Amino acid sequence: FRTDTDNEIVADSSSGGRTSYKNAGKTRRQGVELSVDQQFAGNWRAKAAWTWLDATYRSEVCGDATCEGNRIPGIARNMGFASLGWMPEEGWYAGADVRYMSNIMANDENSAKAPSYTVAGLNTGYKFNYGNWMMDLFGRVDNLFDRNYVGSVIVNESNNRYYEPAPGRNYGVGLSVAYQFN
């Protein structure tokens, strides 16, 4: 894919929780997305997805500094996801997944960036049907290895405090209930 944009509105500066915006002139986003979702050997299921995204300024936006050709801040160039799980239609299921995010520029000058990271997760649950009702009792653990990483950036933060931490290891449980009409 490839998209060229004129007068895109982007973050100019952020200070004290307030962000002002500006027109960036010309920008370009080009890349490739690939994915596979495959069931095999009965109830095993594998998924994988990868995105390469080159998002750049195509005209000057920095005033004193030269930013033409720089990466647009807040956008990762590479993102990946993979999972493998035992996924029967009913009964116990379980799986594992991994997510990757490449470094993310934090300012227009590309002088600050959040480092890349990889995190893993596990999930399990039990699905069952009762008449027209389908229930799924599930749980998952995210950031399984309790990695410290930057979860998001504040683009063009005026005090150079660009980085916001991601949550540590966290857990979730839930119940999904659905009714199928005949």
Please annotate each region the language model reported.
Residues 2-4, 145:
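Flexible, active-site-proximal loop/turn residues at the rims of small-molecule/cofactor binding pockets
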Residues 7-19, 53, 57-66, 105-112, ...:
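Outer-membrane beta-barrel translocator domains and adjoining extracellular loop/strand segments
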Residues 20-23, 162:
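Generic signature of intrinsically disordered, low-complexity, basic-rich segments
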